[in-house]
């Protein structure tokens, strides 16, 4: 990943969140979490993408659901969850309200742009996928259900099947897991006959 092999000081210097700028929450290799500046991460992802292409990678999947608008590959097939998920979720839920769980609050204008494919504006709640236990996730899922959500989307690659099961048990609603959707769509796109 972009932050691999960087010290905490280097991460803070190069990727530290800036006031009034979009942030992301990410998990480091040691299991700790850190908030980072989204635009700085996008620059780092672009650099990493070029390195991967130079190393011969022909397919690159971004393992983050954050919005990246400027990523460009020279020849690799670039798969970006933020471009797949809105259209896929919009097509799946149709005229139903989606409750979106995410690790950090997203500014309203950014959320509107990202989820414009949905027929009904979504409701949103914050729950870290990196917290111990499932209490935050289940509380957020209940809040979304109370707000009228007919289905839930866990909009971060950090959410796991355990989180999905906890939210589904708590609410009885269908729960879409971003990592699962991205993996299935990517697998379908890359299938080659034996």
Language-model region placement:
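Conserved mixed alpha/beta catalytic, RNA-binding, or beta-rich assembly cores of soluble enzyme
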Residues: 62-67, 72-108, 113-115, 123, ...
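Short, flexible loop segments at boundaries between secondary-structure elements
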Residues: 94, 131-132, 172-194
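Short, solvent-exposed amphipathic alpha-helical segments in soluble enzyme
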Residues: 114-119, 168-170, 192
């Amino acid at each position: 990943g972009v932050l691999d092999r960087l010290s905490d000081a280097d991460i803070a210097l190069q990727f530290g969140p800036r006031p009034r700028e979009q942030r992301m929450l990410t998990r480091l290799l040691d299991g700790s979490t850190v908030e980072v500046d989204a635009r700085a991460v996008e620059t780092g992802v672009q650099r990493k993408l070029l390195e991967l292409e130079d190393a011969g990678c022909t397919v690159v999947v971004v393992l983050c659901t954050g919005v990246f608008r400027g990523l460009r590959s020279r020849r690799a097939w670039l798969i970006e969850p933020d471009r797949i998920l809105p259209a896929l979720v919009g097509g799946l839920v149709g005229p139903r309200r989606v409750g979106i769980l995410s690790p950090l609050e997203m500014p309203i204008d950014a959320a509107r742009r990202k989820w414009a494919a949905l027929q009904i504006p979504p409701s949103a709640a914050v729950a870290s996928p990196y917290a111990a236990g499932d209490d935050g996730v289940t509380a957020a899922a209940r809040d979304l259900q109370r707000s009228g959500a007919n289905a839930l989307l866990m909009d971060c690659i950090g959410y796991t099947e355990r989180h999905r099961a906890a939210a589904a048990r708590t609410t009885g609603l269908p729960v879409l897991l971003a990592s699962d959707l991205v993996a299935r769509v990517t697998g379908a796109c890359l299938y080659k006959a034996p």
